[in-house]
């Protein structure tokens, strides 16, 4: 089940650079559901009491702010400072998105978890694989992943992290998450096989490379408009 879930969660990322606010995570989960085998779908349905992956796709953003899951606050990102290579990034002891995805994947693969804990681990995985593929979640510590890089989005003051987390999906189309999933879930079979064989570290490296391009194209005070999103 783990392999199928990870594969499905990467399909959207391989198709387009997508923002990861609530809708982005919903789209990711919707695409995952489209590619589950019957056996995996049945298993997940049992774990989630019939609720969909989409229902739980944003759960971790809220859970990380509760005392029970406060330890997961740093799991949503991995900071790579300007001038550093990916391998030089400081890996904090509290954990980061790459370590979390790797450890959760290993835990699910090993099996033997009580159903309730297995469901929690799966909810986390659904969300964190999405976070790992948003450029600003591999951003710089000095500006908190773009949160302190002030820009204007179609004239509205905001920050670079919010642009990529939330604004970009809505700029192109006012689609529902299900329509987004339908439109972007179009990888050819050869690409699907390549992504299926991928590993979390490779995904994180790809996101960091894209993040560098985003920073270069979005200096402090940048006016982000039609030429940026076209």
Give short role names for the model-derived ranges.
Residues 2, 130-133:
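Residue-level micro-sites within transmembrane alpha helices that shape
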Residues 2-8:
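Sec-dependent signal peptide recognition
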Residues 14-16:
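N-terminal signal peptide c-region/cleavage motif recognized by signal peptidases
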Residues 18-128, 135, 140-230:
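N-terminal, motif-rich segments that launch catalysis or mediate targeting to/interaction with membranes
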């Amino acid at each position: 089940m783990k392999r199928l879930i990870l594969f499905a969660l990467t399909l959207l990322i391989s198709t387009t650079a997508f923002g990861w606010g609530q809708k982005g995570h919903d789209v990711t989960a919707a695409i995952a559901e489209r590619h589950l085998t019957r056996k995996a779908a049945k298993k997940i349905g049992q774990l989630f009491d019939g609720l969909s992956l989409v229902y739980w796709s944003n759960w971790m953003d809220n859970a990380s702010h509760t005392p029970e899951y406060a330890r997961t606050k740093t799991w949503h990102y991995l900071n790579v400072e300007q001038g550093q290579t990916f391998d030089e990034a400081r890996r904090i002891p509290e954990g980061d998105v790459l370590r979390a995805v790797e450890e959760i994947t290993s835990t699910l693969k090993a099996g033997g978890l009580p159903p309730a804990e297995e469901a929690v681990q799966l909810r986390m995985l659904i969300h964190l694989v999405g976070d790992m593929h948003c450029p600003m979640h591999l951003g710089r510590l000095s500006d908190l992943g773009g949160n302190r890089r002030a820009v204007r989005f179609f004239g509205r003051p905001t920050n670079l992290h919010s642009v990529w987390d939330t604004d970009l999906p809505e700029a192109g189309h006012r689609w529902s998450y299900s329509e987004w999933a339908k439109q972007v879930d179009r990888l050819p079979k050869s690409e699907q096989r390549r992504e299926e064989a991928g590993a979390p570290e490779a995904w994180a490296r790809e996101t960091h490379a894209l993040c560098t391009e985003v920073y270069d194209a979005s200096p402090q005070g940048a006016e982000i408009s039609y030429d940026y999103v076209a």
